[in-house]
């Protein structure tokens, strides 16, 4: 009874954002002319994290630090960025911000901020990519780190600014939940999928069975899913895409346990997108544990954390598409609300 009352109070306080997990903040910055942006997550203190890359076309930075056998015990920030390989400059801007705060892994008399990063390919969204000698991502990374807060918007901003799916505008999504044992789980995602978040050509989200309330429209599933609606719609070639995410919890995990959480969270991508983990996607999930609560029943807690993280990521993906607005280019992918909102 005491636990159920506590859970009820916790759920009532949720923002439905990853920042419901204590110990982290989120900031966003974008360049509307270029059609790209950066999302940064700052941790209050060095945080246990690991990651899993299951897509066929990834690009990332400092992922070796996330392996369970790596010496670095914790990370200072995570960057989710547009820009493909050019976007990997964003972590340098975040490192510069953290260095000013005297944050980072201590090595002798100096500190090196540990900032793993994943990127999405948004170079073909009709934004102006003629940026001159150097791309804008280092400054965008610094700006996103400077803007970190517990409150942030979803949709067309940050690393999701230039994101698209097969048929709709993609974007930045987030969601949160509480396990039955009282651990907070949150997800943050850039939805730039090679496939689709909706069923067929209609408004219903593949993630509908996991929706909480009406967080992405409340339409549920269609009355019938026909073979035509199950057909594979995708961008149609090696136009590298990618869905990248961070899942976080306030549970205390080891790096090995965090890696298993990242692997399990990938099933949330498969729940919410058709296609997922494809050859031309670089689907990547980082899992972080801020360690505010010790595990009380390790086997049970880890299983439930994995299940809730998966569902949470599926919901965040749908929210990223649902909240997106179309880019100001011609042509541009339509936003879900522009295409489907009148039916509600």
Features from the language model and the residues they span:
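A structural signal for small-residue-enriched, beta-sheet-centric alpha/beta enzyme cores
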Residues: 3-7, 11-85, 89-92, 99-344
């Amino acid at each position: 009874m005491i636990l159920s009352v506590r859970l009820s109070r916790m759920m009532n306080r949720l923002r439905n954002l990853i920042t419901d997990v204590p110990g982290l903040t989120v900031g966003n910055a974008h360049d509307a002319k270029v059609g790209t942006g950066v999302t940064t997550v700052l941790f209050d203190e060095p945080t246990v994290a690991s990651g899993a890359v299951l897509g066929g076309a990834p690009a990332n930075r400092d992922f070796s630090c996330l392996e369970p056998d790596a010496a670095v015990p914790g990370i200072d920030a995570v960057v989710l960025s547009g820009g493909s390989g050019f976007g990997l400059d964003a972590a340098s801007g975040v490192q510069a911000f953290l260095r000013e705060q005297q944050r980072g892994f201590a090595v002798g008399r100096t500190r090196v901020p540990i900032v793993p990063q994943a990127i999405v390919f948004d170079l073909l969204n009709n934004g102006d990519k003629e940026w001159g000698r150097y791309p804008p991502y280092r400054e965008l990374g610094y700006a996103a780190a400077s803007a970190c807060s517990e409150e942030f918007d979803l949709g067309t901003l940050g690393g999701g600014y230039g994101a698209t799916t097969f048929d709709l505008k993609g974007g930045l999504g987030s969601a949160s939940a509480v396990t039955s044992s009282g651990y907070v789980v949150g997800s943050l995602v850039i939805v730039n999928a090679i496939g689709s978040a909706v069923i067929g050509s209609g408004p219903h989200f593949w993630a509908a069975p996991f929706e909480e309330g009406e967080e992405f429209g409340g339409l549920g599933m269609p009355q019938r899913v026909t073979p035509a609606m199950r057909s594979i719609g995708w961008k149609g070639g090696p136009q590298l895409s990618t869905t990248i995410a961070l899942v976080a919890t306030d549970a205390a995990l080891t790096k090995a346990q965090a890696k298993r959480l990242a692997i399990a969270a990938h099933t949330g991508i498969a729940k919410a997108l058709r296609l997922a983990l494809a050859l031309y996607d670089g689907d990547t999930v980082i899992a972080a544990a801020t360690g505010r609560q010790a595990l009380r029943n390790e086997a049970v807690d880890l299983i439930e954390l994995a299940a809730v993280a998966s569902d949470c990521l599926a919901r965040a993906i749908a929210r990223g598409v649902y909240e997106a607005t179309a880019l100001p280019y011609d042509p541009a992918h339509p936003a879900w609300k522009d295409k489907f909102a009148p039916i509600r």
